[in-house]
Amino acid sequence: MLERIKVCFTESIQTQIAAAEALPEAISRAAMTLVQSLLNGNKILCCGNGTSAANAQHFAASMINRFETERPSLPAIALNTDNVVLTAIANDRLHDEIYAKQVRALGHAGDILLAISTRGNSRDIVKAVEAAVTRDMTIVALTGYDGGELAGLLGPQDVEIRIPSHRSARIQEMHMLTVNCLCDLIDNTLFPHQDD
């Protein structure tokens, strides 16, 4: 059991090292895309399933409340938090539409969809991205594996941050770290002199 614990830590560290080499440009581009959208008075819609939903909620909470420093609230909505809306849509329109219907209702040109999917193949996330495209929104996608169907939907203005791993647990860990990096970059760009 102790050896298995060491393996988990070692794999996580190795994935972080690989990501630190492969992802800084994509993370920086995503952060600047998010910052520019916020400066233009737009909002960020976030979605994911399971652990990805938790990461989406963490991002939205860090925008609305704060990340590490006190600052004005920033407009972000986690689409996976309203159980009444989610179950109403799932019951009437099938599960695949739980985020797409919200994107069509709440999203506007210039807004961002932060779509988080470990494999990039979750039907409800893919449908949300398709809906965002029809609303002239920009997509920031956090994926893993080969990027899945989601990667094929992205245009030149969109940003994919694909974790270099084929292990779901490692991808999810790196998604959380990536969300934290994005929050840090947004805060330090918009509010460079804020104190803790």
Curated annotation (Swiss-Prot):
GO MF annotations in UniProt: carbohydrate derivative binding
UniProt KW Amino-acid biosynthesis keyword: no
Matching PROSITE patterns: SIS
Keyword Transit peptide attributed: no
Keyword annotations: DNA replication
Superkingdom of source: Bacteria
BP GO terms, sorted: carbohydrate derivative metabolic process; DNA replication
InterPro entries associated with the record: DiaA, GmhA/DiaA, SIS_dom, SIS_dom_sf, SIS_GmhA/DiaA_subfam
Pfam families assigned to the protein according to its UniProt record, in alphabetical order: SIS_2
Ranges for domain SIS: 34-196
PANTHER family the record matches: DNAA INITIATOR-ASSOCIATING PROTEIN DIAA, SEDOHEPTULOSE 7-PHOSPHATE ISOMERASE / DNAA INITIATOR-ASSOCIATING FACTOR FOR REPLICATION INITIATION
Function: Required for the timely initiation of chromosomal replication via direct interactions with the DnaA initiator protein.
Record note on quaternary structure: Homotetramer; dimer of dimers.
Family to which the UniProt record says this protein belongs: Belongs to the SIS family. DiaA subfamily.
Record-given protein name: DnaA initiator-associating protein DiaA
Lineage: Bacteria, Pseudomonadati, Pseudomonadota, Gammaproteobacteria, Enterobacterales
